[in-house]
């Protein structure tokens, strides 16, 4: 598997759509590595710019540290050569450092630094957290701003100066002014990633703020649609983006919004619909009920044949 310096990884990620695969579980909720590796191989043929193993869509929050390393290692072994694998780090600082080092052992090419777990902190504390993780690894680090870890442009600018391997910023907040200020201040110093749930919804307006890529969960089960949507965004084809939003993305969001936590559950449901089941979600998430699954199946089947499977 090839290795790349941090800024080359960032450039690769900025050049195309990002794959966030689900993590496959058996009925007893143990990790189904053979099924997961088969899925990673299948996704690899569609040409994403990067693969984020065991991320939010991959139920990072329900995996043990040992499982995270196993999942990342499985992805690294299965992706086609040239496709960067990004591993997660999160929770408290000590755990995040441990996970970053585990990512290196597993052969990952970069780190997605998720928010600390269940704690509030000021900007100085958040900055210290990021510095510690960046100092612990030679891999490029992408900072995920969301929930209880929302970074100001001043903090990010200081971190970008202090941490050469801080190479990306993923936005999970949706504050246009904050993103405008960040991009105006840092420009091309970072790669900017759209990270709101069902990021396709916001992809076109975010493109004007320097956000050239985003995390696509639906790439798991409608990869050609996801890539065609991304291409329409990059072309700034407003009519095509609007059509695809109305035909699929927004109705999909309507199902997703029926219950909290469905941003992950609906992706595994989509896998089931296309005949590539990935097993249940782990608690505290819940799977779609039969009626919701039928709604999603009808939506997927209403789309023109795209050769997904």
From Swiss-Prot:
Pathway where this protein functions: Carbohydrate acid metabolism; D-glucarate degradation; 2,5-dioxopentanoate from D-glucarate: step 2/2
Catalytic activity entry: 5-dehydro-4-deoxy-D-glucarate + H(+) = 2,5-dioxopentanoate + CO2 + H2O
UniProt keyword annotation of Lyase present: yes
Example GO BP: D-glucarate catabolic process
Domain of life assignment: Bacteria
Keywords from the UniProt entry: Lyase
UniProt-listed Enzyme Commission number(s): 4.2.1.41
Keyword Lyase (UniProt): yes
Database matches in SMART domains: DHDPS
Entry similarity comment: Belongs to the DapA family.
Protein name per the record: Probable 5-dehydro-4-deoxyglucarate dehydratase
Organism of derivation: Saccharopolyspora erythraea (strain ATCC 11635 / DSM 40517 / JCM 4748 / NBRC 13426 / NCIMB 8594 / NRRL 2338)
């Amino acid at each position: 598997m090839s290795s790349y310096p941090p800024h080359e990884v960032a450039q690769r990620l900025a050049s195309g759509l990002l794959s966030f695969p689900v993590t496959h579980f058996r009925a007893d909720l143990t990790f189904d590595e053979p099924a997961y590796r088969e899925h990673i191989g299948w996704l690899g043929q569609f040409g994403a710019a990067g693969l984020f193993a065991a991320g939010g869509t991959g139920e990072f929050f329900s995996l043990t540290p040992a499982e995270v390393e196993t999942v990342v290692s499985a992805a690294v072994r299965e992706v086609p050569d040239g496709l960067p694998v990004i591993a997660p780090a999160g929770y408290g600082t000590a755990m995040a450092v441990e996970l970053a080092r585990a990512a290196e052992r597993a052969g990952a090419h970069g780190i997605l630094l998720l928010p600390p777990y269940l704690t509030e902190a000021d900007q100085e504390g958040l900055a210290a957290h990021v510095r510690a993780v960046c100092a612990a690894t030679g891999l490029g680090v992408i900072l995920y701003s969301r929930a209880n870890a929302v970074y100001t442009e001043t903090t990010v600018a200081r971190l970008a100066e202090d941490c050469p391997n801080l190479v990306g910023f993923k936005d999970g907040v949706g504050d246009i002014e904050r993103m405008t200020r960040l991009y105006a201040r840092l420009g091309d110093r970072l790669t900017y990633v759209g990270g709101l749930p069902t990021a396709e919804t916001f992809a076109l307006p975010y493109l004007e703020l320097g956000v050239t890529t985003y995390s696509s969960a639906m790439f798991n089960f409608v990869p050609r649609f996801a890539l065609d949507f991304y291409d329409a965004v990059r072309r700034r084809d407003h009519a095509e983006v609007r059509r695809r939003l109305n035909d699929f993305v927004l109705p999909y969001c309507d199902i997703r919004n029926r219950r909290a936590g469905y941003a992950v559950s609906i992706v595994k449901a989509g896998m089931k619909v296309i005949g590539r089941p990935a097993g249940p979600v782990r608690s505290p998430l819940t799977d779609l009920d039969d009626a919701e699954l039928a709604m999603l199946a009808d939506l997927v089947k209403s789309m023109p044949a795209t050769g997904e499977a």
